[in-house]
Swiss-Prot record:
Keyword Cell inner membrane: no
The keyword Transmembrane is assigned to this record: no
Gene Ontology, cellular component aspect: chloroplast; mitochondrial small ribosomal subunit
Lineage of the organism: Eukaryota, Viridiplantae, Chlorophyta, core chlorophytes, Chlorophyceae
Highest taxon above the source species: Eukaryota
UniProt name for this protein: Small ribosomal subunit protein uS2c
Organism from which the protein derives: Chlamydomonas reinhardtii (Chlamydomonas smithii)
Similarity section: Belongs to the universal ribosomal protein uS2 family.
Location of region: N-terminal extension: 1-306
Domain TRAM intervals: 28-89, 104-169
Length: 570
């Protein structure tokens, strides 16, 4: 009896067990859920990573490699495609036993290694031997890597038996290369910088000193090292260089004073792209100072992912508008073959690539067209800044409206959107002669149209005047009728003889009114007949103008034929 537990304790134990079983059974990656996972890799700052269980990496701080743990999901970052979890319990610990006193390799360590083997996607493999108890090989990411190359590597991720790293440049190498640079090597170089908020002003320039150019922590995906941040200037082009030589590294020395002119509306704290105009070194005893004068080229320059997104959006717009459809393959010019998509069967170098044809039309390479359009835009902006005039030409139906709109919007341009006359630019003298012949015909046409319009206006004015007179007369008649009605009402009380006299007068006046009405009706009929005659005359004039127009077209055709014959003879 004493060993038996009370019923409420048994119920509480059952509830705790069921809750634990529920926690371990959850497999969905939702914030708040408790999940069980195995740590397959180690990142920086002692962060354990599970890479493959849930499709996206799950970061668990303070976890060790090889452990199976229970963790509570805190956040899921959809933009970076990672999840963050909090360690609750270690289910199974690592089985690794330290048989020797060797140290363990951790992320963030820098090593000098020699590449012994090449891997895929610009990677190299370095053998670490028995220097560490958890890693034997190191996979290094670097463009144009070669076997036997000595590289300084920053370890980014550690796994069971191997690790990943990124090639870096030490500060000693940076200082050695930067001191060996000459004035000409700096002149014209470009850097993306952030103007410090504590920069001082001297006349029209912002003045700030370059701090120590230290190598920053590099991400696994991006291997371009920018050494300008919070005052540090430089760009490590050696990492992305094909030769991989340190001679191509361009960095500003640490004891450099920069003079930057704040144009393009740049302010302190803004990200800008600068270009070095002048570079000089000043010696003061044992100390040497470098002075660089730069100008701002671009304000808030786009990063590489932003540039790619902008290019993709512009290509989508070009595809929607159908700019990739070329002319028929039969009409294709030989010079346009470089700007058309081509395909090649097999790997034989002797076989020429043929243009890609769909529905009898060539497909234009939109990447090349975009490059050419940007070049043309840059050239046009130069001419527009000088105040030059432009001629827009587009005779197709799709382009005619756009051409006219663009020319009218610019206010200093001309456009041709109906028909392009041959030799308008190359043979302007003959076209001027044909224009001089057409001008008198056009003047005659304008005079005829002007006469017709004047006659119409005079007829319209006369009709309006007559209508107004009729309106006045009708008003007078109405007044007289009202007076007669009043007189009749007054004379109703008089004798019958008076009534008969009034009736006689009323009949006489009605007769007069009827006669006048008939006269007005006859006049109106005459006016309508005159109007019909004028309409007939107008139609005759229109036919005459059409004949004149056809004669003008015939003249232009004969002129063009004459020009063609003349060109053939010449």
């Amino acid at each position: 009896m004493l060993n038996k537990k009370p019923p409420y304790l048994i119920l509480s134990l059952i509830m705790i067990k069921t809750q634990k079983s529920k926690q371990t059974a959850v497999r969905k990656l939702i914030p708040g859920n408790v999940i069980s996972l195995k740590i397959t890799a180690m990142g920086a700052n002692n962060v354990g990573i599970n890479e493959f269980t849930f499709g996206i990496p799950v970061l668990v701080p303070n976890a060790k490699l090889g452990e199976t743990v229970q963790a509570k999901v805190l956040k899921i970052l959809a933009s970076k495609k990672i999840a963050i979890a909090k360690l609750i319990k270690v289910v199974t610990k690592t089985n690794a036993t330290e048989t020797n006193n060797l140290a363990a390799l951790t992320p963030g360590a820098t090593l000098d290694v020699t590449i012994t083997k090449l891997g895929p996607n610009s990677t190299g493999i370095a053998d670490l031997g028995n220097n560490y108890n958890n890693v034997n090989k190191l996979i290094v990411k670097k463009s144009a890597i070669t076997i036997g190359e000595k590289v300084t590597v920053l370890v980014t991720r550690v796994k069971n038996g191997y690790a990943f790293g990124v090639a870096t440049v030490s500060t000693q190498r940076l200082n050695q290369v930067s001191t060996s640079l000459t004035q000409n090597s700096f002149k014209g170089t470009k850097f993306t910088v952030v103007l410090p908020k504590n920069a001082k002003r001297y006349l029209k320039h912002l003045v700030f000193k370059v701090t120590t150019a230290t190598a920053q922590n590099l991400s696994v995906n991006g291997f371009e090292q920018t050494l300008f941040k919070k005052g540090a200037v430089g760009l490590d082009t050696r990492i992305n260089n094909q030769n991989g030589s340190a001679g191509n590294l361009t960095t500003v020395p640490t004891n450099t004073i920069l003079f930057v002119k704040p144009n393009l509306g740049a302010k302190l704290g803004d990200k800008v792209q600068i270009q070095i105009i002048k570079f000089a070194s000043i010696e003061n005893g044992t100390l040497t100072y470098n002075v660089a004068i730069a100008k701002i080229i671009k304000l808030n320059p786009l990063s590489t992912p932003q540039k790619k997104a902008f290019v993709r959006s512009s290509l989508r717009q070009m595809l929607k508008s159908g700019m990739h459809y070329g002319e028929k393959a039969i009409k294709c010019n030989a010079r346009m073959k470089n700007y058309v998509w081509t395909r090649k069967k097999g790997t034989d170098t002797k076989v020429e690539a043929r243009p890609l044809i769909k529905k009898g039309r060539n497909l234009i390479n939109l990447l090349k067209t975009r490059r050419c359009l940007t070049k043309a835009l840059a050239q046009l902006t130069k001419y527009a800044a000088k105040g030059k005039t432009f001629l827009f030409v587009g005779t197709k139906k799709a382009a005619s409206g756009l051409v006219a709109r663009a020319a009218l919007f610019s206010k200093k341009a001309f456009f041709v959107n109906t028909r392009w006359l041959g030799g308008m630019l190359t043979n302007w003298k003959t076209i001027l002669k044909s224009i001089s012949k057409i001008r008198p015909i056009l003047k005659e046409k304008q005079m005829i149209i002007k006469d017709i319009l004047e006659k119409r206006q005079t007829i319209k004015a006369r009709l309006i005047q007559k209508a107004l007179l009729l309106r006045k007369k009708s008003k007078l008649m109405l007044k007289k009728g009202r007076l007669l009605i009043q007189m009749l009402k007054q004379n109703n009380s008089n004798s019958t003889s008076g009534k008969q006299a009034v009736r006689f007068l009323f009949t006489e006046k009605t007769n007069l009114l009827n006669t006048k009405r008939k006269e007005f009706v006859s006049k109106g009929i005459l006016l309508l007949e005159k109007r019909q005659q004028l309409v007939v005359k107008r139609q005759e004039l229109i036919t005459q103008s059409q004949t004149l127009k056809s004669k003008a077209i015939q003249l232009t055709n004969t002129i063009s034929q004459f020009i063609k014959q003349f060109n053939l003879f010449t």
